[in-house]
Amino acid sequence: MTKITRTFIAFAAACLLAIMLMTVRCFAYDYSTITGTKASGAEISGYSGALEVNVVDFGADKKGKKDSSKAIQKALDYAIDNGSNSVQIKVVVPKGKYRIDKLLEIYSNTWLYLEDGATIVRNFDKGCMIKNAQANGAGGYGSERNIVIEGGCWDGNPSPTSRPFSNMRFGHMKNLWIKNVEIKNNYNGHHVEIGGVKGITIEDCDFHGYTGTFQKEAIQLDTISNSDVFPAYEPFDDTPCDNAVIKNNKFHDLIRGLGSHSACLGVYYTNTLISGNSFYNMSGTAI
């Protein structure tokens, strides 16, 4: 090997090392920019009045022998013409067992309150139990707003013919508060799936019961990017979740507790606080 050849090899090695070092420096993250979360969760207030309706008055069967989805939906529809930023509609579900044969849609300025001992049971094979309506078809956070779901139990009740489903789904909206709710029995989906929502509070809830082999979270935070990631919530404009507080919940007998398994390049979840939750008998990952 000539002197010129040795010199060239040494020079090439030095250049390669310099390039490698430059690459490392380019991708180093400045952790001093992290300032902590500013999450406050859902902000639902300012009502000057409220109207209360009872699902039994619309024909719901609290013994669970017949379909109550039409009756409950009629009660929820009351908010379309009667709810506003100044008037909240409280929909009461008394103690009992209510069978639903199709999904429910909830509108802006609605407080869906299930009394102690009230259980809503899914009795169909495809689709979620409840989702927010999309009255105006807006993207971003511009669809429904100010929705509260409190108390009771939502039983996914999967059957041998069930397709993967989420118990609850919410997207393109602002201010969602889920409080003191038991959500159980999911098949290959999420107990609560949330995409493109700003202002989220989930507290004092109990998530449990999962069948299937998919590695799904009980609570999934998502972006609304395409029909594979978050179907049926057009427009697909990459809206992420922002300002989420998930606290004091119980997760058990599940594969995963909470998290996200999708992302969009350059789009980030912001202001998320996860605090005081308990996880036990998890076969996969807590968070």
Give short role names for the model-derived ranges.
Residues 115-118, 145-156, 174-185, 198-211, ...:
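Right-handed parallel beta-helix
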Residues 55-92:
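Acidic Gly/Asp/Thr-rich repetitive segments characteristic of extracellular carbohydrate-active
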Residues 21-31:
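Sec-dependent signal peptide cleavage junction
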Residues 100-103, 122-127, 158-166, 187-194, ...:
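Short glycine/acidic-rich loop motifs that flank beta-strands on beta-rich extracellular proteins
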Residues 84-128, 132-133, 154:
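N-terminal extracellular ligand-recognition/capping segment immediately after the signal peptide
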Residues 2-12:
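Bacterial N-terminal signal peptides that target proteins for export
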Residues 73-81, 99-108, 123, 138-139, ...:
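Short, T/G/N/S-enriched strand-turn elements that build extracellular solenoid repeat scaffolds
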Residues 12-22:
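Bacterial N-terminal signal peptides
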